Regions:
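Glycine-enriched, solvent-exposed interface loops adjoining structured elements
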Residues: 1-222
């Protein structure tokens, strides 16, 4: 769905789209104030949905070969890969890491450092292999000001909830009943979305841990 479509639906919910078949002018009532606030509220909704009920899967490649995969450096007895800027969290519940030959990569010990780096023991890597990791990314937000034809990120079913979120926050200080009606509809649509179900792996203590970072865990996802 495009930003222009979202904006039109929001104005329709607020009865600010047309009067007697004539499009409402920007100077009418609160129209321009609404138009000014809609883009940021759309981005708020896109981010909330993508980090809760419908996360966005993506893939990254790890390799020790030059000009392939993420940037890396040797860091003690580990290899430190720089995570992409849109990294949110690892996806678990399926084959998280595979080689280019289709083998599951059992890292046994990994570490996330400052949500920016992934550290994996050197002994787990082989040159000539390419390792693929599935992760969840942050959504791409609308540029400000957005163009009417700008596409929203995430799957289409998430877009149909966004107008209700935006409309709710446009009236939150003026009409508590209308706010509740819109926000309840937004939550109802989220609740009916097909969940992205996966088994979760939790960080565990590493008895051989060094002082290198923040979180340790086993890569057991298969």
């Amino acid at each position: 769905m495009t930003y222009g479509q979202i904006k039109d639906q929001v104005l329709q919910l607020l009865n600010q789209y047309s009067v007697a078949g004539t499009m409402v002018a920007n100077t009418y009532n609160n129209q321009q104030d609404y138009l000014n606030r809609i883009p940021n509220l759309v981005n708020d909704a896109v981010m909330e949905i993508a980090t809760t009920v419908r996360r966005i899967p993506a893939f990254l490649t790890l390799s020790l070969d030059e000009d392939s995969g993420l940037a890396y450096e040797e860091f003690g007895d580990r290899i430190r890969f720089e995570l992409p800027e849109d990294f949110y969290q690892f996806k678990t519940g399926d084959t998280l890491v595979t080689t280019n030959e289709g083998h599951v990569f059992h890292g046994n010990r990994y570490m996330i450092e400052g949500r920016k780096y992934l550290l994996i023991p050197k002994r787990e890597f082989q040159r000539g292999h390419v390792y693929t990791i599935t992760y969840y990314r942050y959504p791409k937000l609308l540029a400000l000001p957005p163009a009417a034809e700008d596409e929203l990120d995430n799957v289409p079913e998430t877009h149909y909830a966004i107008p209700f979120y935006v409309a709710a926050y446009l009236v939150i200080h003026d009409d508590s009943f209308l706010y509740a009606s819109f926000y309840n509809k937004y939550e109802d649509k989220l609740a009916k979305m097909t969940p992205d179900i996966s088994a979760e792996a939790h960080p565990v203590s590493d008895v051989y841990a060094t002082s290198l970072g923040d979180a340790y865990g086993d890569i057991y996802w298969t």
